[in-house]
């Protein structure tokens, strides 16, 4: 009886170790990258961001138009000027944000480099309504 108990205890111990090992290995698998949230304020002829450097990966831009005019939000490589730009397999399009309104746009930016957010409402970009930020390697 004592030998039976010892064998059974060994089996239970081995099963427990196996379960713990499998669980530990599963936890070591690749994790989805965290979404970086960036607060962006649009006002007459200015765009300000709460971050100027973000890691590559998914980004959620939360735009708040505190101005009295409608503004656009366009994401593009720094130095571009309203040129077609593909991101996430789709063209980065302008999002119009009415005065006093907010909008959320999500993109995955995998390529490190310098980017800009710009407003191309007629005359706004020319008055300095753009800002640049850096995407760093994860």
Could you describe each region identified by the protein language model?
Residues 50-74, 103-115, 137:
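Beta-strand cores of secreted/periplasmic/IMS beta-sandwich domains, seen most often
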Residues 74-80:
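Short Gly/aromatic-enriched secondary-structure transition segments
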